[in-house]
Design a protein with these regions (language model features):
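Active-site beta->alpha loop and helix N-cap motifs at the rims of alpha/beta catalytic domains
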Residues: 2-148
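Catalytic alpha/beta core domains of metabolic enzymes, predominantly
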Residues: 127, 142-251
Length: 253
């Protein structure tokens, strides 16, 4: 899926002092990224504080951020994950209507690791796929959801129509999951879920990376991607190690 940019940046959600959504702040972040060579954004992920927001707040953010990003010609993916299939479908349809290029979702969390079986998660994603006419991406974040998908589950996801995988799981198995998501659909998108494995993901066949680090240092992340595309692994390794230091200094989220 070559239409996806190699770097997608998860935009932080901006708030006012009273806790209200600060849409202009988010627009400023998006403009900053665009001015520094970023052409794709990921909305309402972990950096976007999606578990802390009401559905109405997510709708407001999606509308404002997509309008601004699309005016700049940026590619947009919106996370619509919730514990409720109906609410996730509502968010997915809204994102599609506002011009999102794709939607994504984690598994329906809270009960994910204790009560749901893999077939329950498959049914959740199949329902979202059937509700929209844009690609649906599985956001694998086992640390947050408690569900670590087996390889067979990832292969079955593509059979439901899921178009790709953002992988923030066990990085030792990246190659295996990359192959699994493409077993049924060779064009399925595979995204490394963290800048810490940007280099490793590229080497196992990832289409790109979702990079929170690029919120602060977009030039550093785009330089790493350029080195990879030029086959300069020595320079890419140097930049990857530098990015690891930046990530430690920044902390998570």
């Amino acid at each position: 899926m070559n239409r996806w940019p190699p770097i997608l940046v998860p935009v932080i959600t901006s708030f006012q002092d009273n806790g209200a959504i600060f849409s202009d702040g988010m627009k400023n972040v998006i403009s900053f990224l665009y001015e520094h060579g970023i052409t794709g954004i990921w909305l309402l992920g972990s950096y976007g504080s999606f578990p802390l927001l009401t559905n109405q707040e997510r709708i407001v953010i999606t509308t404002a951020a997509l309008k601004h990003a699309k005016s700049l010609g940026m590619t947009t993916i919106v996370n619509v994950g919730t514990p409720s299939t109906a609410l996730s479908i509502e968010l997915a349809r809204h994102a599609e209507n506002e011009g999102a290029d794709a939607v994504a979702s984690v598994v329906p969390f809270y009960y994910a690791s204790t009560h749901y079986r893999p077939e329950n998660h498959l049914a959740f994603f199949e329902a979202i796929v059937k509700s929209v006419n844009i690609p649906v991406i599985f956001y694998n974040n086992a640390d947050a959801t408690g569900f670590s998908p087996p390889t067979a589950f990832i292969q079955q996801l593509t059979e439901t129509g899921v178009a790709g995988l953002k992988d923030k799981g066990d990085f030792a198995a990246m190659s295996e999951r990359c192959q699994a998501i493409r077993a049924t659909n060779p064009d399925a998108i595979y995204l490394s879920g963290a800048t810490s494995v940007h280099l490793q993901g590229y080497l196992v066949g990832a289409n790109g990376v979702t990079s929170g680090t690029a919120l602060a240092t977009p030039a550093l992340v785009t330089s790493l991607q350029k080195a990879l595309e030029q086959g300069n692994i020595q320079e890419a390794t140097r930049l990857q190690n530098l990015i690891l230091k930046v990530r430690i200094a920044m902390g998570r989220y």
